[in-house]
């Protein structure tokens, strides 16, 4: 998180979102850290259905950037509470490109590194399902070598979790 004011704003925003849904928040974070994509999908879709509007998430391919930015910001807000264990960065260069979100463990022996890539489903890119969109995100992580920063900082490749988040309106699908 860039600075204290932004961090404070995210914390306040997230606490407001989850004041009635703290179980969902904790479930999502626990699932993310444990690599449990089933629980991540269940929780994120419950949150999406109960909290988001189609005006937030967009419905058409022409709205590709807006929903990606919306989900990107939302997930960053969820991750803010992990700042004591991770260095959380967004839209930084690593390898041959710029990843969406990276969690670099402050202690690589205790915690895994995490890379998250967001994609909006789009038939024009040959995607037939949200699973295709997830595959596209995961391929991008590999082809662009986003893990380079983590490995350079001592996180072994086998301790790096790579997640693709795919979106179509309020539908969310997450894979590894």
Regions found by a protein language model. Name each.
Residues 149-176:
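Domain-level recognition of nuclease-like catalytic cores that cleave nucleotide substrates
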Residues 1-145, 172-176:
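Extended alpha-helical interface modules used as scaffolds for assembling large macromolecular complexes
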